[in-house]
Protein backbone atom coordinates (compact mmCIF):
# COMPACT_ATOMS: atom_id res chain seq x y z
CA UNK A 1 0.00 0.00 0.00
CA UNK A 2 1.27 3.49 -0.87
CA UNK A 3 1.90 5.88 1.97
CA UNK A 4 0.48 9.36 1.58
CA UNK A 5 3.24 11.93 1.39
CA UNK A 6 3.08 15.67 1.75
CA UNK A 7 0.09 17.67 2.83
CA UNK A 8 -3.34 16.08 2.76
CA UNK A 9 -5.59 17.26 -0.07
CA UNK A 10 -8.01 19.85 1.28
CA UNK A 11 -11.68 19.54 0.34
CA UNK A 12 -12.84 21.60 -2.63
CA UNK A 13 -16.05 23.64 -2.58
CA UNK A 14 -18.40 22.25 -5.21
CA UNK A 15 -21.56 24.05 -6.33
CA UNK A 16 -23.06 21.29 -8.49
CA UNK A 17 -23.05 17.53 -8.34
CA UNK A 18 -24.11 15.64 -11.46
CA UNK A 19 -27.44 13.82 -11.78
CA UNK A 20 -25.93 11.49 -14.37
CA UNK A 21 -22.69 9.87 -13.28
CA UNK A 22 -21.90 7.35 -16.00
CA UNK A 23 -21.16 7.77 -19.70
CA UNK A 24 -20.25 5.05 -22.17
CA UNK A 25 -19.79 4.65 -25.90
CA UNK A 26 -23.01 3.79 -27.71
CA UNK A 27 -23.35 0.21 -28.89
CA UNK A 28 -20.58 -1.20 -26.71
CA UNK A 29 -21.65 -3.53 -23.90
CA UNK A 30 -20.70 -2.25 -20.46
CA UNK A 31 -19.14 -5.59 -19.56
CA UNK A 32 -16.45 -5.11 -22.20
CA UNK A 33 -15.47 -1.56 -21.30
CA UNK A 34 -12.63 -0.16 -19.27
CA UNK A 35 -13.71 2.69 -16.99
CA UNK A 36 -12.04 6.04 -16.30
CA UNK A 37 -13.03 7.56 -12.93
CA UNK A 38 -13.49 11.32 -12.73
CA UNK A 39 -13.88 12.85 -9.26
CA UNK A 40 -16.57 15.39 -8.41
CA UNK A 41 -13.97 18.14 -7.89
CA UNK A 42 -12.34 17.39 -11.25
CA UNK A 43 -15.74 17.73 -12.91
CA UNK A 44 -16.28 21.02 -11.05
CA UNK A 45 -12.94 22.32 -12.38
CA UNK A 46 -14.03 21.48 -15.95
CA UNK A 47 -17.42 23.12 -15.40
CA UNK A 48 -16.04 26.36 -13.99
CA UNK A 49 -13.36 26.90 -16.66
CA UNK A 50 -14.79 25.28 -19.79
CA UNK A 51 -18.52 25.94 -19.33
CA UNK A 52 -18.73 29.06 -17.14
CA UNK A 53 -15.64 30.57 -18.76
CA UNK A 54 -13.91 31.57 -15.52
CA UNK A 55 -10.20 32.24 -15.46
CA UNK A 56 -8.31 29.61 -13.50
CA UNK A 57 -7.42 32.13 -10.79
CA UNK A 58 -11.09 33.05 -10.25
CA UNK A 59 -12.18 29.41 -10.38
CA UNK A 60 -9.52 28.45 -7.81
CA UNK A 61 -10.83 31.14 -5.45
CA UNK A 62 -14.38 29.90 -5.89
CA UNK A 63 -13.33 26.31 -5.15
CA UNK A 64 -11.20 27.43 -2.20
CA UNK A 65 -7.77 26.16 -3.26
CA UNK A 66 -4.54 27.55 -4.67
CA UNK A 67 -4.16 28.15 -8.40
CA UNK A 68 -1.69 25.28 -8.58
CA UNK A 69 -4.04 22.84 -6.82
CA UNK A 70 -6.86 23.92 -9.12
CA UNK A 71 -4.63 23.53 -12.18
CA UNK A 72 -3.77 19.96 -11.10
CA UNK A 73 -7.49 19.10 -10.79
CA UNK A 74 -8.25 20.65 -14.19
CA UNK A 75 -5.27 18.97 -15.87
CA UNK A 76 -6.24 15.56 -14.46
CA UNK A 77 -9.87 16.00 -15.54
CA UNK A 78 -8.98 17.01 -19.09
CA UNK A 79 -6.53 14.11 -19.40
CA UNK A 80 -9.11 11.58 -18.18
CA UNK A 81 -11.87 12.86 -20.47
CA UNK A 82 -9.53 12.96 -23.48
CA UNK A 83 -8.31 9.43 -22.73
CA UNK A 84 -11.85 8.07 -22.43
CA UNK A 85 -13.08 9.78 -25.61
CA UNK A 86 -10.07 8.83 -27.72
CA UNK A 87 -9.88 5.19 -26.60
CA UNK A 88 -13.59 4.37 -26.20
CA UNK A 89 -13.62 3.98 -22.43
CA UNK A 90 -16.54 4.67 -20.12
CA UNK A 91 -16.45 7.67 -17.76
CA UNK A 92 -17.66 7.25 -14.20
CA UNK A 93 -18.06 10.34 -12.01
CA UNK A 94 -17.74 9.54 -8.33
CA UNK A 95 -15.99 10.26 -5.09
CA UNK A 96 -13.41 12.83 -4.26
CA UNK A 97 -12.77 15.21 -1.40
CA UNK A 98 -15.30 18.02 -1.59
CA UNK A 99 -17.87 20.05 0.30
CA UNK A 100 -21.20 20.76 -1.40
CA UNK A 101 -22.12 24.47 -1.18
CA UNK A 102 -25.13 26.41 -2.38
CA UNK A 103 -24.68 28.46 -5.54
CA UNK A 104 -24.60 32.21 -4.94
CA UNK A 105 -27.18 34.20 -6.91
CA UNK A 106 -24.72 36.87 -8.01
CA UNK A 107 -20.98 37.37 -8.14
CA UNK A 108 -21.33 39.93 -5.35
CA UNK A 109 -22.99 37.30 -3.14
CA UNK A 110 -20.19 34.86 -3.99
CA UNK A 111 -17.55 37.44 -3.02
CA UNK A 112 -19.32 38.07 0.30
CA UNK A 113 -19.54 34.33 0.93
CA UNK A 114 -15.80 33.88 0.25
CA UNK A 115 -14.94 36.87 2.46
CA UNK A 116 -16.97 35.43 5.35
CA UNK A 117 -15.23 32.06 4.98
CA UNK A 118 -11.80 33.71 5.09
CA UNK A 119 -12.74 35.57 8.28
CA UNK A 120 -13.78 32.38 10.07
Curated annotation (Swiss-Prot):
InterPro entries with a match to the protein in the record: UPF0251, WH-like_DNA-bd_sf
Chain coiled-coil ranges: none
Top-level taxon: Archaea
Gene3D superfamilies: Winged helix-like DNA-binding domain superfamily/Winged helix DNA-binding domain
Matches recorded under Pfam families: DUF134
PANTHER family, per the entry: PTHR37478, UPF0251 PROTEIN TK0562
Family: Belongs to the UPF0251 family.
Stated name of the protein: UPF0251 protein MM_0989
Organism: Methanosarcina mazei (strain ATCC BAA-159 / DSM 3647 / Goe1 / Go1 / JCM 11833 / OCM 88) (Methanosarcina frisia)
Amino acid sequence: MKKCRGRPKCPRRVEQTPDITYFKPRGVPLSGLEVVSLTIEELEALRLVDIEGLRQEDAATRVGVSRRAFWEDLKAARMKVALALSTGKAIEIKGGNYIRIETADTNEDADKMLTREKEI
